[in-house]
């Protein structure tokens, strides 16, 4: 494998700035890697070869002219195909957006371009980000680089798989109920869900607007922090963004000392549905943090048990509202538009043909939850539970600085294993949903491999609102401790993907 592929984003940025290497050669190396292995992985839906190389050359020219750019200038970036990209097709992995090319960039894509990052292309996801395995994509599933017969998590499996297979050093994701953290956990990469409202949703195709949170995906904690710093901040185009300074995430990622940090282990996020190997790796990681000087206590958050059922009422309710905009009248797919069918018939036929089974399931569930006679019993009750979960977090912060749990109940399951059982699929989000319900920041960090199936295991770290830096501090400590134990990053243990399929 080309050495440029294994360098961290921080290392690439430093060498590009020092003109030891060029952005063009780094970008070309990643494009070559995509051509070599993505037939096996299917992380990308679209690769912008010409656009990426052109952007890289422009960065090289600016550096040659003496401009001092940011720490990620010239570094390639994969973008989840939920972010609008001007002049580049954006599909949300759905047939409904067939042929649609956005006339503008999302705020976060704009910020990445302003920071000098080079967009390689758009990555695969579950349709409209609805799923936990990247199997509901209209364009086929993504495969886990650790085992091509297993899922890479979801919804953002494409972004995580692109990192784990060394096709990109950085990626953008979105997290509504775990769609950054869960893929990170099962692919051995780092995934961060920032505080809700600290990253702009403008230009991100909406799924559940009170939960959707864009965030960084990377192979190292520092790389995630550098990307986080580049994309976060208030945006006048998104009135839900928080007008406060971004926490010092990069400084925290460089600090690997956890002496005196109070860590709470959530008692409710364990039990029979958890793989014993996942729990074993989790408790080993907790012991390492204790040995490093952290203070660990058990914390009860009783309403976390209600988070998953409440989430799967609130999220579909918002889906049923957001997806109503796809009416075949203005853009995207249009079926039976032959002059002989009414607008209502065209709309019905288009939605029937363009939306997948999971999208339809959640629209129906959400519409039912919002319907007259059921609103208070379902949606209203779920919102009350959401408040109780927020109170659980508030009580927890009186006892500890961060909360930790396994990032997922199991390791990556086999492709097709849960597609016929929606409830089993939904349980993949058991650990991650509470943070979304509260708007709290959370991250997933690799902590080892299952001795049963050899697949990665992740630890989740949660922090108070706008205390994202605490996540990076604990994550950086974990990374250092485990690198010392293993002698190399976890991904060094991953099997080589050779592009033979």
UniProtKB/Swiss-Prot annotation:
- This entry's Enzyme Commission designation comes to 6.3.5.7
Return one Gene Ontology term, BP aspect: translation
The residues the entry assigns to the signal sequence are none
**UniProt GO molecular function:** ATP binding; glutaminyl-tRNA synthase (glutamine-hydrolyzing) activity
Output the Gene3D superfamilies linked to this UniProt entry.
Amidase signature (AS) domain
Looking up SUPFAM superfamilies in the UniProt record yields: Amidase signature (AS) enzymes (SSF75304)
Q: Which GO terms describe its cellular component?
A: glutamyl-tRNA(Gln) amidotransferase complex
Tell me which UniProt keywords the record has, alphabetically. ATP-binding, Ligase, Nucleotide-binding, Protein biosynthesis
Organism's domain of life? Bacteria
Q: Which residues form the active site?
A: 80, 155, 179
Q: Which reaction does it catalyse?
A: L-glutamyl-tRNA(Gln) + L-glutamine + ATP + H2O = L-glutaminyl-tRNA(Gln) + L-glutamate + ADP + phosphate + H(+)
Q: Where are the transmembrane segments?
A: none
The record's listing under InterPro entries reads: Amidase, Amidase_CS, Amidase_dom, AS_sf, GatA
Q: A Pfam family this protein belongs to?
A: Amidase
HAMAP family given for it?
A: GatA
Q: What is the stated purpose of this protein? A: Allows the formation of correctly charged Gln-tRNA(Gln) through the transamidation of misacylated Glu-tRNA(Gln) in organisms which lack glutaminyl-tRNA synthetase. The reaction takes place in the presence of glutamine and ATP through an activated gamma-phospho-Glu-tRNA(Gln).
Subunit annotation: Heterotrimer of A, B and C subunits.
Family classification:
Belongs to the amidase family. GatA subfamily.
- Protein's recorded name: Glutamyl-tRNA(Gln) amidotransferase subunit A
Q: Which organism is it from?
A: Cutibacterium acnes (strain DSM 16379 / KPA171202)
Identify the coding gene. gatA
């Amino acid at each position: 494998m080309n050495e440029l592929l294994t360098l961290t984003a921080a290392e690439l940025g430093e060498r590009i700035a020092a003109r030891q290497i060029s952005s063009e050669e780094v970008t070309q190396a990643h494009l070559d890697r995509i051509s070599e292995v993505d037939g096996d992985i299917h992380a990308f839906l679209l690769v912008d070869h010409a656009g990426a190389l052109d952007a890289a050359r422009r960065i090289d020219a600016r550096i040659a002219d003496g401009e001092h750019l940011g720490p990620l200038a010239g570094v390639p970036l994969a973008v989840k195909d939920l972010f609008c990209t001007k002049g580049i097709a954006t599909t949300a992995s759905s047939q409904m957006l067939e042929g649609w090319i956005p006339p503008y960039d999302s705020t976060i894509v704009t910020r990445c371009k302003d920071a000098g990052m080079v967009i390689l292309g758009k990555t695969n996801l579950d349709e409209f980000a609805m799923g936990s395995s990247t199997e509901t994509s209209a364009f086929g599933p993504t495969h886990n680089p650790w085992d091509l017969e297993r899922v890479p998590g979801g919804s953002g499996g494409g972004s995580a798989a692109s990192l784990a297979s060394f096709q990109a050093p950085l990626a953008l994701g979105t997290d509504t109920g775990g769609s950054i953290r869960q893929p990170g956990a099962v692919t051995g990469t780092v995934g961060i869900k920032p505080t809700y409202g600290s990253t702009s949703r403008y230009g991100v195709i909406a799924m559940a607007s009170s939960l959707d949170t864009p965030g960084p995906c990377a192979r190292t904690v520092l790389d995630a922090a550098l990307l986080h710093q580049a994309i976060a901040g208030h945006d006048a185009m998104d009135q839900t963004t928080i007008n406060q300074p971004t926490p010092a995430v990069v400084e925290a990622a460089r600090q690997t000392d956890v002496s005196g940090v109070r860590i709470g282990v959530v008692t409710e996020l364990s039990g029979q549905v958890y793989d014993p190997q996942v729990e074993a790796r989790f408790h080993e990681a907790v012991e390492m943090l204790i040995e490093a000087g952290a203070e660990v206590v058990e914390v009860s958050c009783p309403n976390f048990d209600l988070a998953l059922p409440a989430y799967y009422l609130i999220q579909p309710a918002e889906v049923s509202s957001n997806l109503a905009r796809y009416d075949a009248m203005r853009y995207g797919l249009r079926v039976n538009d032959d002059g002989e069918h009414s607008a209502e018939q065209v709309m019905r036929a288009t939605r029937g043909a363009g939306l997948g089974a999971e999208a339809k399931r959640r629209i129906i569930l959400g519409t039912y939850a919002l319907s007259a006679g059921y609103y208070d019993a379902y949606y209203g009750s779920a919102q009350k539970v959401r408040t109780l979960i927020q109170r659980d977090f508030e009580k927890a912060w009186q006892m500890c600085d961060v909360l930790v749990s396994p990032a997922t109940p199991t390791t990556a399951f086999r492709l097709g294993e849960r597609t016929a059982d929606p409830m089993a699929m939904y349980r993949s989000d058991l650990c991650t949903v509470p943070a979304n319900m509260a708007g709290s920041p959370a991250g997933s960090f690799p902590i080892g491999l299952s001795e049963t199936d050899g697949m990665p295991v992740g630890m989740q770290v949660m922090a108070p609102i706008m205390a994202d830096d605490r996540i990076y501090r604990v994550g950086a400590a974990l990374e250092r401790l485990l690198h010392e134990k293993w002698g190399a990053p976890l991904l060094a243990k991953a099997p080589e993907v050779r592009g033979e399929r």
